[in-house]
C-alpha cells in the first residue's frame, strides 16, 4: 500500500505530536520517557529533512522503526494510564501506516501482553491488536498466537464492554488469520512449495512443514479451536484457560463459512476437517451411547472413549442440548454446503443424522431443526447436483438425495394422518375454516399452513441468542416440508437445466454423463415429491397454497420433460390431469385412461395417496355439473352419470393447460392424456369449438344426455380456460416435426373415439376435430410435416355415417386446402400444391355426394381464384380430381358428372394456353374418363370433341415444347382414344375411331421413330387385342333399346364388326403413312408380324364385311395406294433395266417382312378356302358328289343356293382381293422362298382350294366375266398368279424349276372343271338361267384357258430335265383322255377339240424325249394308247354334225394317227412290245370300223380319211417284214403281224357280209355293214398298192392271192349298193396289178 505526499506529511506531524505530548506528560515523573520522546522527535525531524520524496521518507521511517518505538514502549511499561494511552495511540499510527517492522511487531506484541497481564487499558489493547495483526504479515507464529490468546483472555474479562470488544476482536483476528492465508496464496499463486522435513515424524504441536507461514498459523489456530471445543489443551494458543463451546462452534462456523477456499486449496486443512472437525461434530451430536456408535462409524475419528469421559460436564444436558445442537446443525449445513467435495463420507453421515432427527423427534425441536437444515441443503442446486453425482449415481452407494426426498414425503404423509379426532379438534377445524386461514384438510384432519417460509428464513437455526428452542407453531413441520419440497423441486429442475444445457466445448461423452446424472436426480426425487405434492394438493384448501403446489407440480413436469423421463413424466402429468377433473378416478372411469402402474415400491404411495381417492375434499366450490364426455372404451351406462367440477379443478386445469402449453415440446407420448383431459374439460364446461377451431361457452342441445349446469362463478374461469385452450393450438403449431406429429396422432385417436361414439347415434365431442383443424390452420408453414396424416384422417371422417361430422370434416379439409395453397412455407411450391391437391384427390374414394360436391366446389374455387398461381405440377392433380368423379363407387351421379365436366371444360377453355404443356397428358386422360362414363352419352361424345381440339393444340405447341414433350402427350392422347375405341357404346366407339384416325392422319407425322414403338406396342396392339376379343364375344341378339337402329347394326356383333373394320382400316393407313418411322424400330419385324396376325384373323373371320375389309387393309399395307387393276403380271420381263412401276409405288419393306407377309397370304388364302369348303359341307342343298375321278363342281364358278344358318362363305370379292395381292407380293419373295412353297401341297393346293369356294347365290348375279378374256376377276387373278409363279420358275439360274410340274397339275385341275358332268338338278348361281348356259360362260372359258396355259407351260419347259423327268406328260395325256372321251358330250365342243390339239402338241413334245429314256417313260406308251383309244373309239357321238365339221374332226384324228405313225411306230423297236401290239390293234380297228350311223349324209358315213390313215400306219408297220438283214427281227415280226391281222380282218368282214346279205333276202343290210365291207375292200386295195411299191413283201403277196376268192365271193352282193359295187370293181382291178408283177420273189417261208 503506497502512501501519498499528503498522508506521509500527516504521519510525520502526527508522530511528532504524539512524541511531544508524551514528552510533556512524562516530564514530571517519567524523565526517561521524556528524553526518549525528545530523541524520537529529533530523529523524526532528521529523517524528514533527509528524505527526498514520500517513498524515501516512509522507507527511512520503517528503517528507524525500533528507535521510534522505544519511547512508546517505555511509556507502556510505566503502566501510567495517560502515557499508555498516548503510546498505544502512537503504536496504532505506526501500525496503520505500516511503519512497523517484524521486530517492532514482536516488541509491540510483548508489551501488549504485559498490559493485558496487568489489566491495563484492556479496551485500548483490543483496539490495537486487530490492526496489528491485519495490517501486514509481520505478526506470525507465536507472536500471532499471543495476539489471539490476548483477545480470548479479554473475552472472559469482568467488564462487559471489554468482553464484547474482545468477542469482536477474537472473531476479527480469527478471520484475519485466514484472510492472510488467502493473501499468501495470492502472492504465491504458483504451486505450493513442499518443505521436506529434516527427518522423523512431524511434531504434533507444529504445523505441517508443507505450509507457508500464514497457512501454518491458520492451521494451528483452527486445530487449537477444535481442541478447545473438544475440551482439550491447545498446542499453539498457549495461555487460554477457558472458552465456551458455543463460542468455539461459532468461530468454527464463521471460518468454515468465510474461508472455504483455504480448506479446499490446502489438503492439510482438509485433513483437519476430516480428522478433527467431523469427529467432533459427530460426538457432540450424540454424547450418549448412540454417539459412540456413530463415532465408531467414522474412519478418521480420533476421539476415544477416555477423551469423552474426561470432557467436563457443563450445565444440564437438556438445557445445553439445543444451542449446541443448533450450532452443530449450522456447521453441518455449512460442511455440506461448502465441503461436500472433500468430505463425501462425512457429509453422507451428517445428512443421515439430520434424517434421523427428522424421523424421530423426541424433543419437539429436532425435526423442525433438521428440516430447516435439510431445507437449506436441498434448496441449493449445487448440493442437489453433488448428492446426485456422489451418491445416487453410484451403484453401491446410499442414495442420499432419494432418502431426503422420501423422508420429506414420509413426514408429509405422517402429518396428514389423523390418529384421533375429538370434539375440540372439530371446533378448532370449524374456527380455522371460519377464519379463512390456509391449511390442509384430509379426512377430517385440519392442519394450518404457516406462511412466508423460505430456506433462508428459519426459526430454530437463527436462534443463536437463545438457550432454549422457541415454541413451534402447529403445522410448521408440514408447512416447512411443503416449502422444502417446492424448493427441492426447483433445485432439481435447476440441476437438470444446468446439466442439460448443451456446452459447445463439451465432449459427447461428457454430455451423455451429464444427462445420466440429470435423469438419476429426477428419477430419485420425482416419486416422493409427486406423492407428497399430490397429497398436499389434494388436501389444500387455500388457493394460494394450491397454486404453489401446482407450480411445483408444473416444475416437476418441466424437469421430467428436460430429462426425457417418460414414465415419471407420465405420472406427473397424470396427477395434474386428475387434479383438473371431478375425481381422481375420472380418467380411468370415464375416459378409459388408467393411472400409470408403479414400477417400484416407492411409487406405490402415489397410487395409494392420490389415484385411489374416491373424491376430492368437498371444501372447494362447485362450478359445473353434468354428464361426462362419452367415450367408446367405457360402458355406455356411465355416459349418463352426473359429475361435479370444482373451483380447484379449474385452478388445476389452468395450470395443466399452461403447463402442457409451456412444455409442449417434451410431452411426447403423453399427448393423448393431455388432449383427452382438455376434451373432457371442454365437454364438462360446455365449451364448444367454433368453425375456426376456437372455444367458447355454449349451451348444450336439448336432446343431449342431461344438460351441463355451469355457475356464474365459473364463467370467468371458463373464459380464461378458453383463452388458454386457444393458446394450445399455436403452441402445438410451433413444435418440432416429431413432437407435432405426436400431437396429431393423439388428436386423431381422440377423433376416432368420437367417431365411434357418433356411430351409436349419440352426441360426440368435436374437440379433436376442432383442435386438429385449428392446429393445422396455424401450422400451414410446416404443411409438409402433418398434411398427409391429417388429411387422411379428415378423409376418414368424411366417410363416416354421421352426416354432421362428415360435413364438418369435409368443410375443414377443403378450407385447409384453400388456405394451404396460398400459404408461404419452406416447402417447394411445387411439392406444396401437389400435396394439398392430392388430399383433395383422396376424397374421390368417398361415396357420399355432399363430400364430393364440396370437393368439386373447392377445386372450382381454386381454379377461379388462384388458377393463375397454380404451378405446373398442380394442374395434373386438379385435373385428376375432376376426372375422378367418374367412378363406379359414386354411381356416376349425374349432377356430379355435369359439374365435373364443367370444370374440365373450364380447364380446356380458360387454362389450356396457360397451363404447362406437361399437364396436357393429365387433361387428356381426364377427358377420356368423361368420354367413358355411361351416365350421359352426350358428355362422352362432347369429351371426344375436346380431345380433337386438344390434339390441334398439341400440334401447335410442338415447336415450342419440343418433340419429347409433345410425343409424351401424343402417347396419352392415342392411348385414351384407343380405349374409347373399345367402348361398350357403338356411337362412342365410332366417334373415337374417327377421332383417332383423324388425329393420326393430321398429326401423326409429328412422332419420331422411337415414339412409334410405344404407339405400336402400348396402344395399337392392345387396341387390336381388345377389338378382336370384343368382336369374338359380342352378342348376336338384336338390341331391345329404345333407339331404332338399322338392321345392319341391330346387334352387338354387327356393331363390333364395324368397329373392327374401322380400327383395322385406320391402323393400316397408319402403317402406310408412317412406314419410314416404323422401319426405324428395332423390332419392326415383331410389329409387322403382330399386325399381320390381326389382319389374318380378321380376313378369315366369319363375316363378309370384316373379312373383305381386312383383305383390303392387308393389300393396302403391303402395296400402298396401288390399284388392283394396274397389277403387272409380267413384272420379271419388264424389270431388266429399270425399276418397275410396282416397286416405285409399293411402300418400303425389308425382305424378312415380305417373307412374313407371304406366309400370312398363304394363311389367309387357306382360311378363306377352308371356310368355303366348310360351307359346302354344311350346305343344305349340296350336290351329290361324283363317283368318278373328275373333280367336283364346287368351285368359284359354282354356287350354293342355300346355306345352313350361321355358315359364312367368302365371296368372289374376297378371293379376288387376296389374289390381287399375290403378284407383287410374290415378286418380292420369289428369291427367298424354297421350292417346297411352290409344290402342289403348298401354293397350288391353296389356289385350287380357293377355286373350289362356291359363289353365294346373292352374289352370283354380280360376278360378270371380262369382255376380253371371258373370265371372272377371280379366275383372272388365279391364272395370273400361276403365270407369275411360272415366269419365276423359268428364270435362268432359279432353284424353283422343279415346281413347274406342280403348276401344270394345278392348271389341269382348273381345266378339268370343263369335263364335269352336269346333273339334271344342277341350278345355276342366282337361278336366272340353266346351269349349262352358265357353265358355257363362266366355267368353260376358264378351263380351256387353263388348259392352253398348261400346254404352253409344258411345251415351253419340256426340255428342262426337272420338268420332263417329273412325268408330267403322262398326267397331261391322261387328263386329255377325259375330254377326248367325252368328245361331243362335253359342255362345249371346243373343249375336246382343244384337248385334241393339246394332245398332239404334247405328243410331239414328249415322245421324242421319251424314246431317249424308255425306262423312265415306260408308262407313257400305255397312257397314249389309253387316250387314243378313248378318243378314236369313244361311244359319245354327236347327234347333229355337219359334214365339213365331221371332216375337220376326222382330220384332227388323222393328225393324231400321223403323229403315232411317225413318232411311235417308226421307232417301234424302242417301244415295249405290248404297247406296240396295242397300237397295231388300234390302227387295225381304226382302219376298218370307223362308221358313224348317225350321219345324215350317206356320202360321208365313213371316216375314210381316218381309215386311210390307220391303214397307212398299219402298212407302214408292215415294212418290218422286209427288214430282215437291215433291222432287228422285232420290227419284221411286227410287220407280218400287222399284215396278217389286217387280212384276217378283211376276210372275216367279207365272209360275214356275204352270209348276212344272202340271209337278208330282199331286206337291205344296214348302212354300217355296207360301209364296213367297203372299208375292207379299200384295205385290200391299199395292201395291193403297197405291194406294188415294194415287191419284196412275199408274205403279203401270198396272203393277198389267198384272199382273192373271198373278194370274188362279194361279187353277187355288190348290186345291193352302188358304192360297194364300185369299190369291188376297183379292188378286182387292183389284183391285175398284183398278177402282172414280173418279179415275184420267192418265199422263204
UniProtKB/Swiss-Prot annotation:
A family per Pfam: Sec7-like_HUS
Keyword Glycoprotein: no
Recorded coiled-coil stretches: none
InterPro entries: ARM-type_fold, DCB_dom, Mon2/Sec7/BIG1-like_HUS, Mon2_C
Keyword Protein transport: yes
Biological process according to GO: protein transport
Key words of the record: Protein transport, Transport
Physiological role: May be required for traffic between late Golgi and early endosomes.
Similarity comment text for this entry: Belongs to the MON2 family.
The protein's name: Protein MON2 homolog
Organism lineage: Eukaryota, Metazoa, Ecdysozoa, Nematoda, Chromadorea
Amino acid at each position: 500500500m503506497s502512501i501519498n505526499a499528503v498522508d506521509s506529511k500527516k504521519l510525520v506531524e502526527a508522530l511528532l505530536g504524539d512524541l511531544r505530548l508524551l514528552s510533556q506528560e512524562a516530564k514530571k515523573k517519567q524523565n526517561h520517557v521524556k528524553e526518549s520522546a525528545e530523541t524520537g522527535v529529533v530523529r523524526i525531524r532528521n529523517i524528514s529533512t533527509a528524505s527526498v520524496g514520500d517513498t524515501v521518507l516512509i522507507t527511512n521511517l520503517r528503517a528507524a522503526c525500533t528507535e521510534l518505538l522505544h519511547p512508546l514502549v517505555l511509556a507502556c511499561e510505566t503502566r501510567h494510564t495517560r502515557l499508555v494511552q498516548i503510546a498505544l495511540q502512537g503504536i496504532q499510527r505506526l501500525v496503520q501506516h505500516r511503519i512497523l517492522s517484524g521486530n517492532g511487531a514482536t516488541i509491540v506484541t510483548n508489551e501488549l501482553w504485559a498490559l493485558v497481564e496487568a489489566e491495563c487499558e484492556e479496551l485500548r489493547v483490543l483496539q490495537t491488536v486487530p490492526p496489528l495483526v491485519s495490517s501486514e504479515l509481520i505478526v506470525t507464529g507465536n507472536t500471532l498466537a499471543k495476539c489471539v490468546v490476548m483477545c480470548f483472555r479479554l473475552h472472559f474479562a469482568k467488564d462487559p464492554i471489554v468482553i464484547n470488544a474482545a468477542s469482536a476482536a477474537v472473531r476479527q483476528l480469527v478471520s484475519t488469520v485466514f484472510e492472510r492465508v488467502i493473501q499468501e496464496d495470492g502472492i504465491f499463486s504458483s504451486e505450493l512449495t513442499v518443505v521436506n522435513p529434516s527427518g522423523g515424524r512431524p511434531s504434533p504441536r507444529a504445523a505441517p512443514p508443507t505450509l507457508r507461514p500464514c497457512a501454518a498459523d491458520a492451521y494451528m489456530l483452527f486445530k487449537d479451536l477444535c481442541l478447545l471445543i473438544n475440551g482439550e489443551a491447545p498446542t499453539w494458543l498457549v495461555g487460554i484457560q477457558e472458552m465456551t463451546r458455543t463460542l468455539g462452534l461459532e468461530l468454527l462456523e464463521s471460518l468454515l463459512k468465510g474461508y472455504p477456499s483455504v480448506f479446499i486449496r490446502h489438503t492439510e486443512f482438509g485433513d483437519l476437517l476430516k480428522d478433527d472437525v467431523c469427529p467432533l461434530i459427530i460426538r457432540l451430536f450424540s454424547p450418549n451411547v448412540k454417539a459412540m456408535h456413530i463415532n465408531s462409524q467414522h474412519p478418521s475419528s480420533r476421539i476415544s472413549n477416555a477423551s469423552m469421559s474426561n470432557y467436563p460436564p457443563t450445565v444440564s444436558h437438556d438445557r445445553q442440548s439445543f444451542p449446541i445442537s443448533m450450532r452443530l446443525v449450522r456447521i453441518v449445513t455449512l460442511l455440506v454446503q461448502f465441503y461436500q467435495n472433500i468430505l463425501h463420507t462425512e457429509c453422507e453421515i451428517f445428512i443421515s443424522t439430520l434424517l434421523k432427527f427428522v424421523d424421530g423427534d423426541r424433543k419437539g425441536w429436532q425435526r423442525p431443526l433438521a428440516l430447516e437444515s435439510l431445507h437449506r441443503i436441498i434448496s441449493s442446486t449445487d448440493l442437489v447436483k453433488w448428492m446426485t453425482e456422489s451418491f445416487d449415481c453410484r451403484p453401491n452407494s446410499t442414495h442420499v438425495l432419494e432418502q431426503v426426498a422420501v423422508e420429506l414425503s414420509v413426514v408429509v404423509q405422517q402429518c396428514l394422518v389423523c390418529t384421533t379426532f375429538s370434539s375440540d379438534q372439530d371446533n378448532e377445524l370449524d374456527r380455522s375454516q371460519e377464519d379463512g386461514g390456509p391449511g390442509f384438510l384430509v379426512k377430517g384432519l385440519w392442519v394450518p399452513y404457516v406462511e412466508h417460509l423460505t430456506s433462508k428464513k428459519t426459526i430454530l437455526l437463527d436462534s443463536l441468542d437463545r438457550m432454549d428452542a422457541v415454541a413451534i407453531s402447529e403445522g410448521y413441520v408440514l408447512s416447512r416440508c411443503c416449502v422444502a419440497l417446492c424448493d427441492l423441486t426447483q433445485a432439481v429442475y435447476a440441476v437438470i437445466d444446468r446439466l442439460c444445457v448443451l456446452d459447445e466445448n463439451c465432449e459427447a461423452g461428457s454430455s451423455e454423463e451429464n444427462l445420466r446424472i440429470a435423469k438419476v436426480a429426477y428419477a430419485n426425487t420425482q416419486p416422493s415429491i409427486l406423492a407428497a405434492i399430490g397429497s398436499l394438493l389434494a388436501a389444500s384448501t387455500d388457493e394460494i397454497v394450491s397454486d404453489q403446489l401446482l407450480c411445483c407440480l408444473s416444475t416437476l413436469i418441466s424437469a421430467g420433460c428436460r430429462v426425457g423421463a417418460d414414465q415419471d413424466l407420465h405420472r406427473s402429468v397424470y396427477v395434474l390431469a386428475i387434479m383438473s377433473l371431478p375425481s381422481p378416478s375420472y380418467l380411468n372411469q370415464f375416459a378409459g385412461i388408467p393411472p400409470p402402474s408403479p414400477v417400484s415400491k416407492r411409487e406405490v404411495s402415489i397410487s395409494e395417496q392420490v389415484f385411489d381417492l374416491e373424491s376430492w375434499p368437498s371444501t372447494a366450490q362447485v362450478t359445473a355439473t353434468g354428464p361426462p364426455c362419452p367415450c367408446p372404451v367405457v360402458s355406455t351406462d356411465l355416459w349418463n352419470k352426473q359429475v361435479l367440477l370444482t373451483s380447484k379443478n379449474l385452478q388445476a386445469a389452468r395450470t395443466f393447460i399452461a403447463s402442457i402449453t409451456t412444455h409442449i415440446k417434451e410431452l411426447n407420448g403423453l399427448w393423448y392424456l393431455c388432449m383427452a383431459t382438455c376434451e373432457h374439460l371442454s365437454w364438462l364446461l360446455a365449451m364448444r369449438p367454433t368453425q375456426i377451431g376456437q372455444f367458447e361457452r355454449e349451451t348444450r342441445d336439448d336432446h343431449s344426455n342431461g344438460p351441463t349446469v355451469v355457475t356464474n362463478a365459473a364463467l370467468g374461469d371458463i373464459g380464461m380456460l378458453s383463452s388458454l385452450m386457444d393458446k394450445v393450438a399455436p403452441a402445438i403449431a410451433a413444435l418440432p416435426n416429431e413432437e407435432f406429429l405426436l400431437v396429431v396422432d393423439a388428436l386423431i385417436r381422440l377423433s376416432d373415439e368420437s367417431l365411434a361414439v357418433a356411430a351409436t347415434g349419440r352426441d360426440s365431442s368435436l374437440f379433436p376435430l376442432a383442435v386438429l383443424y385449428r392446429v393445422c390452420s396455424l401450422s400451414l408453414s410446416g404443411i409438409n410435416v402433418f398434411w398427409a396424416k391429417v388429411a387422411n384422417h379428415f378423409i376418414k371422417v368424411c366417410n363416416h355415417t354421421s352426416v354432421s361430422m362428415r360435413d364438418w370434416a369435409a368443410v375443414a379439409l377443403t378450407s385447409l386446402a384453400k388456405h394451404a395453397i396460398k400459404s408461404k412455407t419452406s416447402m417447394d411450391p411445387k411439392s406444396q400444391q401437389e400435396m394439398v391437391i392430392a388430399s383433395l384427390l383422396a376424397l374421390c374414394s368417398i361415396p357420399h355426394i355432399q363430400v364430393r360436391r364440396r370437393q368439386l366446389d373447392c377445386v372450382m374455387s381454386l381454379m377461379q381464384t388462384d388458377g393463375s398461381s397454380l404451378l405446373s405440377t398442380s394442374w395434373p392433380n386438379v385435373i385428376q380430381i375432376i376426372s375422378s368423379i367418374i367412378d363406379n363407387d359414386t354411381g356416376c351421379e349425374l349432377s356430379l358428372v355435369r359439374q365435373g365436366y364443367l370444370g374440365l371444360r373450364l380447364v380446356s377453355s380458360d387454362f389450356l394456353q396457360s397451363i404447362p404443356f406437361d399437364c396436357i397428358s393429365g387433361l387428356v386422360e381426364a377427358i377420356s374418363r368423361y368420354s367413358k362414363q355411361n351416365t350421359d352419352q352426350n358428355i362422352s361424345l362432347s369429351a371426344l370433341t375436346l380431345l380433337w381440339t386438344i390434339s390441334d393444340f398439341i400440334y401447335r405447341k410442338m415447336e415450342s415444347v419440343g418433340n419429347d414433350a409433345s410425343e409424351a402427350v401424343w402417347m396419352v392422347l392415342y392411348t385414351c382414344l384407343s380405349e374409347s375405341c373399345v367402348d361398350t357404346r357403338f356411337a362412342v366407339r365410332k366417334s373415337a375411331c374417327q377421332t383417332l384416325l383423324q388425329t393420326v392422319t393430321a398429326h401423326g407425322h409429328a412422332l419420331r421413330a422411337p415414339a412409334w414403338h410405344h404407339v405400336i406396342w402400348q396402344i395399337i396392339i392392345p387396341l387390336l387385342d381388345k377389338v378382336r376379343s370384343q368382336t369374338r364375344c359380342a352378342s348376336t341378339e338384336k338390341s331391345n333399346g329404345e333407339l331404332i337402329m338399322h338392321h345392319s347394326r341391330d346387334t352387338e356383333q354387327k356393331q363390333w364388326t364395324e368397329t373392327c373394320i374401322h380400327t383395322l382400316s385406320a391402323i393400316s393407313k397408319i402403317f402406310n403413312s408412317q412406314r419410314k418411322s416404323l422401319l426405324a424400330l428395332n423390332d419392326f419385324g415383331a410389329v409387322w408380324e403382330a399386325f399381320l396376325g390381326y389382319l389374318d384373323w380378321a380376313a378369315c373371320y366369319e363375316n363378309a364385311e370384316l373379312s373383305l375389309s381386312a383383305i383390303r387393309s392387308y393389300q393396302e399395307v403391303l402395296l400402298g395406294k396401288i390399284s388392283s387393276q394396274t397389277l403387272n403380271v409380267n413384272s420379271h420381263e419388264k424389270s431388266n433395266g429399270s425399276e418397275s412401276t410396282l416397286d416405285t409405288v409399293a411402300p418400303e419393306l425389308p425382305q424378312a417382312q415380305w417373307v412374313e407377309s407371304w406366309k400370312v397370304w398363304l394363311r389367309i388364302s387357306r382360311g378363306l378356302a377352308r371356310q368355303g369348303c366348310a360351307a359346302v359341307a354344311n350346305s343344305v342343298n349340296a350336290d351329290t358328289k361324283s363317283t368318278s375321278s373328275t373333280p367336283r363342281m364346287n368351285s368359284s364358278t359354282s354356287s350354293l343356293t342355300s346355306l345352313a344358318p350361321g355358315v359364312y362363305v367368302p365371296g368372289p370379292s374376297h378371293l379376288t382381293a387376296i389374289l390381287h395381292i399375290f403378284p407383287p407380293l410374290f415378286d418380292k419373295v420369289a428369291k427367298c422362298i424354297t421350292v417346297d412353297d411352290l409344290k402342289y401341297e403348298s401354293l397350288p393346293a391353296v389356289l385350287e382350294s380357293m377355286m373350289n369356294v362356291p359363289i353365294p347365290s346373292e352374289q352370283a348375279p354380280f360376278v360378270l366375266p371380262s369382255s376380253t378374256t371371258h373370265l371372272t376377276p377371280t379366275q383372272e387373278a388365279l391364272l395370273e398368279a400361276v403365270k407369275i409363279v411360272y415366269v419365276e420358275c423359268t428364270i435362268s439360274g432359279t432353284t424353283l424349276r422343279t415346281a413347274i410340274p406342280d403348276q401344270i397339275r394345278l392348271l389341269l385341275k382348273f381345266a378339268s372343271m370343263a369335263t364335269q358332268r352336269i346333273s339334271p338338278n344342277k341350278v345355276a348361281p342366282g337361278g336366272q338361267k340353266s346351269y349349262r348356259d352358265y357353265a358355257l360362260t363362266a366355267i368353260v372359258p376358264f378351263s380351256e384357258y387353263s388348259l392352253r396355259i398348261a400346254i404352253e407351260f409344258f411345251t415351253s419347259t419340256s426340255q428342262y430335265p426337272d420338268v420332263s423327268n417329273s412325268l408330267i406328260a403322262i398326267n397331261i395325256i391322261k387328263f386329255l383322255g377325259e375330254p377326248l372321251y367325252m368328245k361331243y358330250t362335253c359342255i362345249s365342243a371346243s373343249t375336246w377339240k382343244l384337248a385334241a390339239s393339246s394332245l398332239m402338241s404334247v405328243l410331239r413334245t414328249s415322245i421324242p424325249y421319251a424314246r431317249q429314256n424308255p425306262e423312265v417313260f415306260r408308262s407313257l406308251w400305255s397312257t397314249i394308247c389309253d387316250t387314243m383309244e378313248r378318243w378314236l373309239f369313244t361311244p359319245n357321238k354327236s347327234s347333229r354334225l355337219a359334214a365339213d365339221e365331221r371332216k375337220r374332226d376326222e382330220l384332227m384324228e388323222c393328225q393324231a394317227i400321223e403323229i403315232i405313225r411317225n413318232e411311235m411306230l417308226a421307232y417301234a423297236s424302242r417301244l415295249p412290245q405290248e404297247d406296240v401290239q396295242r397300237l397295231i390293234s388300234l390302227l387295225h380297228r381304226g382302219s376298218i370300223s370307223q362308221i358313224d350311223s348317225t350321219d345324215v349324209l350317206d356320202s360321208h358315213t365313213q371316216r375314210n380319211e381316218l381309215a386311210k390313215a390307220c391303214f397307212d400306219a398299219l402298212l407302214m408297220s408292215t415294212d418290218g417284214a422286209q427288214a430282215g438283214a437291215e433291222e432287228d427281227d422285232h420290227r419284221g415280226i411286227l410287220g407280218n403281224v400287222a399284215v396278217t391281222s389286217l387280212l384276217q380282218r378283211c376276210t372275216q368282214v367279207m365272209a360275214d357280209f356275204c352270209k348276212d346279205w344272202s340271209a337278208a333276202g330282199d331286206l337291205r343290210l344296214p348302212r354300217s355293214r355296207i360301209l364296213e365291207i367297203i372299208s375292207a375292200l379299200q384295205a385290200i386295195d391299199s395292201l395291193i398298192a403297197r405291194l406294188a411299191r415294194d415287191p419284196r413283201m412275199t408274205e403279203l403277196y401270198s396272203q393277198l392271192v389267198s384272199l382273192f376268192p373271198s373278194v370274188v365271193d362279194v361279187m353277187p352282193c355288190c348290186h345291193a349298193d352302188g358304192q360297194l359295187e364300185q369299190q369291188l370293181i376297183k379292188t378286182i382291178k387292183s389284183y391285175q396289178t398284183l398278177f402282172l408283177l414280173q418279179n415275184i420273189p420267192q418265199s422263204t417261208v
